[in-house]
Structure formats: C-alpha cells, structure tokens
C-alpha cells in the first residue's frame, strides 16, 4: 500500500517548522549512516537529539495523531521520532531499502519498521529533481508533493531520491511500527474503514448493515493486531 496524505501540516505550520529547522545545526547525513547507506547517501541531516529536531518532531507527531487518514492507513503502534534531511544541488540518495529495526534516539525504544513516511517541507517549485522514487510490483512511483503533504509506503520497498539540480529539498522522514504487521491485511482494513465511512454518510448511523460491517472490522483488527 502506498498512500498520499494531504495537508498533514498547514502552510502556517510548514512556515513555522521551516523557520526552526533552517536555523538548526545541519551536518553531513552520513554521520548517522551504516556502511551500506553511506555508499548511497549524499545529503544533510539535522542531529536527532537537537532541540530543533525535537521541537518540530513533536509538532509533526501531534499532527499525525490527529489525522484520520494517517491513523486509518497506518494503524500506528509506535511512531519513530521524526528525522529531518535536506538535499542541495548535486545531492541525492541512491537505491536502498530501509533497515528492518530502528532505535528511537529520543526514547531509546526499538521498533520494527513496517511503514516509511516522508513529509515534504519544501514546495515542488522551489527545487528541481529531488523526487522520491518508490519501486513495487507495479513499477516505479515518482513522488514530489506540496509542502505539508506526506507519502506513506511499505518499508520493504526499494526507493531512492533523485539528484537535486536546483534549489533545496527539505523533508521529514520517519518510520511506523503498525498494529498490523502484514501490509495486505493493513490495506484490507483501510479499504473496509473507508467503505464504512462512505456508507455511513448515505444511511442512518444505526443502520444494521453499518453496525455489522463495523463489527467485522473490529473483529479482524482484534484477530490480527499485535499490541
């Protein structure tokens, strides 16, 4: 499942976050890389324990937890503290797959990376290149979204960031351990949740079919969830 989540942050929130981030102590992105990633990555990152990263990360997590589409799609058990990167001219990130297990630098908690998420913090017209390209069974998906929008995709996906040729691409990236480990089951639950919500707008909320479908949804969630 690959899903665009629009307007996670408002434009005012994006401006606030960018003002904080732009003043932060950016470093070579390979400071946080393992051997394999260091050969592929060419970008800058904000130290995960910096005051700026923690401040903006808290804003993002609060916005995510209040976003119905994100919650329905990800069914998050744990959200890794958001990280931040930026790509200037000539920078990119070659094909790679994200690590299966990550340690949260803020809480120290380990989590399984079921879903990866990129939240764009620069407008598409502010830079050339810098597209996120995610590969799945159906081919390559090229992603370049408005500032404040996010893309959610399985962490098993091969992906890369194309070289920036003009301007600067700033984004937040993070991982989610879902209550539902399996992507296919998670996708089915999202489809069912969306269908129930659509039907609820067309019939009475106490309609027997709606109540029955809602019960099926929660019983499947109960059967599949890992808490």
UniProtKB/Swiss-Prot annotation:
Family annotation (InterPro entries): Oxoglu/Fe-dep_dioxygenase_dom, PKHD_C, PKHD_hydroxylase, Pro_4_hyd_alph, Pro_4_hyd_alph_FE2OG_OXY
Domain Fe2OG dioxygenase, residue spans: 78-178
Name recorded for this polypeptide: PKHD-type hydroxylase CC_0027
GO molecular function: 2-oxoglutarate-dependent dioxygenase activity; iron ion binding; L-ascorbic acid binding
Enzyme Commission code(s) on record: 1.14.11.-
Biological process annotations from GO: DNA damage response; intracellular iron ion homeostasis
Organism of origin: Caulobacter vibrioides (strain ATCC 19089 / CIP 103742 / CB 15) (Caulobacter crescentus)
Residues annotated to bind Fe cation: 96, 98, 159
Iron among keywords: yes
Superkingdom of origin: Bacteria
């Amino acid at each position: 499942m690959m899903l665009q989540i629009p307007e996670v942050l408002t434009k005012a929130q994006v401006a606030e976050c960018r003002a904080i981030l732009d003043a932060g102590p950016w470093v070579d992105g390979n400071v946080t890389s393992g051997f394999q990633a260091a050969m592929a990555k060419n970008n800058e990152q904000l130290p995960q324990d910096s005051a700026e990263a923690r401040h903006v990360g808290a804003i993002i997590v609060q916005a995510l937890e209040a976003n119905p589409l994100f919650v329905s799609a990800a069914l998050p058990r744990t959200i890794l503290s958001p990280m931040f990167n930026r790509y200037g001219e000539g920078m990119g990130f070659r094909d790679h797959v994200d690590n299966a297990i990550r340690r949260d630098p803020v809480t120290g908690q380990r989590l399984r990376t079921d879903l990866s998420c990129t939240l764009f913090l620069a407008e598409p017209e502010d830079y050339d290149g810098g597209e996120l390209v995610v590969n799945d069974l159906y081919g390559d998906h090229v992603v370049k979204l408005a500032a404040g929008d996010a893309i959610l995709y399985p962490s098993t996906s091969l992906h890369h960031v194309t070289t920036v040729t003009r301007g600067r691409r700033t984004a937040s990236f993070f991982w989610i351990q879902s209550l539902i480990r399996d992507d296919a089951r998670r996708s089915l639950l999202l489809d069912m949740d969306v269908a129930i919500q659509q039907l609820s707008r067309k019939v009475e909320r106490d309609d027997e079919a709606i109540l029955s479908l809602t019960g099926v949804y929660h019983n499947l969630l109960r059967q599949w969830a890992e808490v």
